[in-house]
Amino acid sequence: MASKIETLKANLEAALGARVVSLTEAIGELTLVVKASDYLEVAKTLRDDPKLRFEQLIDLCGIDYQTYGDGAYDGPRFAAVSQLLSVTNNWRLRLRVFAPDDDLPIVPSLVDTWSSSNWYEREAFDLYGLVFEGHPDLRRLLTDYGFIGHPFRKDFPVSGYVEMRYDPEEKRVVYQPVTIEPREITPRVIREDRYGGLKH
């Protein structure tokens, strides 16, 4: 008798055929990689096929592969990864799609297939700059309105570009370039035998 993973793998290969770029198993879960051009069609098949029935998208995130692994990675830079759940069959599936263009990463939106992807896609847009084509309200979710850049990209500086502070003269919050002053930290060495009442 085939295991659940083997049954799911066979059902995916039968339903999707040549649209499967890769299908791998890791840590007891399958990862399905598809092309951006097939992404929407595959998502609808995963949801509607009676042998698959992935009714829920439970998570979606962006990934920046710029410095992936040992630095020898040569594939596309950005991907969107969805975690799917079939309540009917008690299956989970990781669906990954790579954006074909690294300079302007665009992938189709899954909002019409799974409405739960709405805010997840907004978060991935905000933090990674992934543009979800067809999204009804693609705007920033976590960063400030005037924020420049996408903070989870690997080429974004850790300190950021600007900092905000309250200006008492203008009586409002203002932005200014980041000011990080280098400082030397000298460890404090205590040489007293009974410092702070401690007994040795």
Swiss-Prot record:
Keyword Glycosyltransferase part of the UniProt annotation: no
GO molecular function: NADH dehydrogenase (ubiquinone) activity; NADH:ubiquinone reductase (non-electrogenic) activity; quinone binding
UniProt entry keywords in alphabetical sequence: Cell inner membrane, Cell membrane, Membrane, NAD, Quinone, Translocase, Transport, Ubiquinone
EC number: 7.1.1.-
Disulphide connectivity of cysteines: none
Compartment list: Cell inner membrane
Bilayer topology annotation: Peripheral membrane protein
InterPro entries, alphabetized: NADH_DH_suC, NADH_quin_OxRdtase_su_C/D-like, NADH_UbQ_OxRdtase_30kDa_su, NADH_UbQ_OxRdtase_CS
Any Pfam family the entry gives: Complex1_30kDa
SUPFAM superfamilies listed in its UniProt record: Nqo5-like
PROSITE patterns documented for this protein: COMPLEX1_30K
Main EC class the enzyme belongs to: translocase
Catalytic activity: a quinone + NADH + 5 H(+)(in) = a quinol + NAD(+) + 4 H(+)(out)
Predominant place of localization: membrane
Gene3D superfamilies hit by this protein: NADH:ubiquinone oxidoreductase, 30kDa subunit
GO cellular component: plasma membrane
Described purpose of this protein according to its UniProt entry: NDH-1 shuttles electrons from NADH, via FMN and iron-sulfur (Fe-S) centers, to quinones in the respiratory chain. The immediate electron acceptor for the enzyme in this species is believed to be ubiquinone. Couples the redox reaction to proton translocation (for every two electrons transferred, four hydrogen ions are translocated across the cytoplasmic membrane), and thus conserves the redox energy in a proton gradient.
Assigned protein family: Belongs to the complex I 30 kDa subunit family.
Quaternary structure, from the entry: NDH-1 is composed of 14 different subunits. Subunits NuoB, C, D, E, F, and G constitute the peripheral sector of the complex.
Record's protein name: NADH-quinone oxidoreductase subunit C
Organism from which the protein derives: Burkholderia vietnamiensis (strain G4 / LMG 22486) (Burkholderia cepacia (strain R1808))
Gene: nuoC
